[in-house]
Each structure stands twice: as structure tokens, then as C-alpha cells.
Amino acid sequence: MEKSRMLWTFVERWLLALASWSWGLCRISLLPLIVTFHLYGGIILLLLIFVSIAGILYKFQDMLLYFPEQPSSSRLYVPMPTGIPHENIFIKTKDGVLLNLILLRYTGDNAAYSPTIIYFHGNAGNIGHRLPNALLMLVNLKVNLILVDYRGYGKSEGEASEEGLYIDSEAVLDYVMTRSDLDKTKIFLFGRSLGGAVAIHLASENSHRISAIMVENTFLSIPHMASTLFSFFPMRYLPLWCYKNKFLSYRKISQCRMPSLFISGLSDQLIPPVMMKQLYELSPARTKRLAIFPDGTHNDTWQCQGYFTALEQFIKEVIKSHSSEEMAKTSSNVTII
């Protein structure tokens, strides 16, 4: 019994000594921390706020960028065209995601030689919501249209991401190239808003397969948009790795040397119209056009007078320029409609 009491007393004293030594070490360590915070507390606080905001933005970036469920039921119901030739198509991407497409067929004169437009929509809704715009393209431009629902949108599977959208666009282009009933020498890309960034990426990687691109009310990059939308915080100083989605169109446009049409609505309240002008200026294309619509809003520029005329003139110019003599010429202009 006496031996057990002595052992317990020894252990108790040892634990007390260890606690006392640990507390002394804590006090010694605390001193430089107090001094550092006293001297640099403001800077440390700013850094903590900066890192916290960057972390929150990174985690919730997809929620801030992709809106596949707006308007409500967009994931459940996709309107289909009626009374016109069309196909409801499902294809698989290289990573196994099932995508839904709608092909609108032009059936008028010389339909076999009609251009095909691959249509990339914005960050909300589904392809069915773009049918009013697409049907007017079909009638006015005499083209085939393939409307694309990205992964996570409409009836397509998966979840949206930057890399995923790039894979989707590549899969759609590959699919178009397998269609013997579509003229592969007249493939046009059209992208509005987020779709413009997808179109620019696809064009930058496939210049040999794409005749021309047409982008409308799109942005330079997500970091540029973050600086615009969150101007109260110095977002421009955030490094690129803080952004889960980047969509660096201002860099990728340098690889798009095919004829390019930039469509800008000056009444766009979401994406600054100056970004469209900057993309136009950054474009190295020999044939490039900037069509400006003073009354054009972000989603409804296509309803402005002269919109389809601008697209029609551009498409005709591109088709005509297939001759090597025409392609050798460099031309650019700005049209205000």
C-alpha cells in the first residue's frame, strides 16, 4: 500500500512539473505573438479577412456562376419546338456524361449546303428557353442550329464546372463532325454570356474545324467579372488560384484567328460592354466585326432592330471568303445599329 502511495505521489508531482513547464513555455511563446500582433495587427487582420473571403468565394463559386434551376423547373421541363423539323439528341462525353442537344433543321433551298451554328447559351435556364431566339435564327439566317445543354442543365446529366463545359463543347463538335448530312466546312460557333467563353475556348482549340465564331455580351474572364461585381473589395489582387472557375477568354481569343463577330448591347447591366470591345481589339482575326446595339440588354440584344441583318451579313461574308483570294485580305470594322 505504501509503495502504491509513493508511486502515485511521484506521478502527481511529475504531472504538476510538466504542466508548470508547459505553461512557462506557453508564456514565452505568447510574448512574441503579442508583440507581433501589436506591431502588425492591422496587416494580419486584413490578411485574415482576405484569405477568408477568398476561401468563401472559392467554395461557393459554382453557386455564384451556374444557375441551372432558374427559372424554376428548368431541370424538369425542357420546351421542345413544334411544327418544324428537329431532333432531340443525347450524346456522351469522353468522361461519360450524357448531354441533351436539340438540332433544328433548315429545309429550304440548298439546305444541304446550309451552315450549322452550334449554340452555347448563358448560365441559367435550358435550351428550350432559347427556342424563340433560335427559331428566328433558323428563319432569318437559313442555317441549321444545334442547341447545347451543358452538364447539369436541362436534361443533361452531371454538374457544371469550367472543365466540364469545355469537355461538353468538344463532344458536341465531335458529334457534328460525324453527321454526314451537315456541311462540315461551314461550322459556326455562337455563344452568349457564359456561352461566349465556351465558344472562344472551343475555337481556340479547334481552329482547323471551325469556320467562324460569333460571341454576344460575354466577358474577358471570371476574375475580371469578380472585380466588376465586387468592386468594394480589391478582387483584382486575388491570385488566379483563388478562382475555381476562370474562363480566361482574354487570353484564349489570341488563338482564334478565324473570322469573328462580336455583338455588344450597350444597355447590358450585367457584363460591362467595354469587355466586348476589348475582346474585339484583342482578336487577331483577319476578318473581325463589332456590331453595337445601343438599346441591347444582356439577354435581349437579339430583339434589337438590325440584329439578324448583322449576323446574316457576317455569315455571307465568311462563306464568300472561302476563296483564298478573299481570305488573304485583312478587314475589321465597327457597326453601330
UniProtKB/Swiss-Prot annotation:
Q: How does it sit in the membrane?
A: Single-pass type II membrane protein
Q: The AB hydrolase-1 domain covers which part of the protein?
A: 115-222
Signal sequence span per UniProt?
A: none
rRNA-binding listed as a keyword = no
The UniProt transmembrane annotation reads 37-57
Q: Would the keyword DNA-binding turn up in this protein's UniProt record?
A: no
- What molecular function does GO assign, one term? palmitoyl-(protein) hydrolase activity
Q: Where in the cell is it found?
A: Membrane
Which Gene3D superfamilies does the UniProt entry name for this protein? alpha/beta hydrolase
Q: Which UniProt keywords apply?
A: Glycoprotein, Hydrolase, Membrane, Signal-anchor, Transmembrane, Transmembrane helix
Q: What is its EC number?
A: 3.-.-.-
Query: What InterPro entries does this protein's entry cite?
Result: AB_hydrolase_1, AB_hydrolase_fold
Per the Swiss-Prot or TrEMBL record, the active site comprises S193, D268, H298
Out of the domains of life, which is the source? Eukaryota
Positions annotated with a glycan in the UniProt record: N299
Q: Which Pfam families match?
A: Abhydrolase_1 (PF00561)
Give the disulfide map: none
GO CC annotation: membrane
**Homology family:** Belongs to the serine esterase family.
Q: What protein name does the entry list?
A: Protein ABHD13
* Protein species of origin: Gallus gallus
* Gene name in the database record: ABHD13
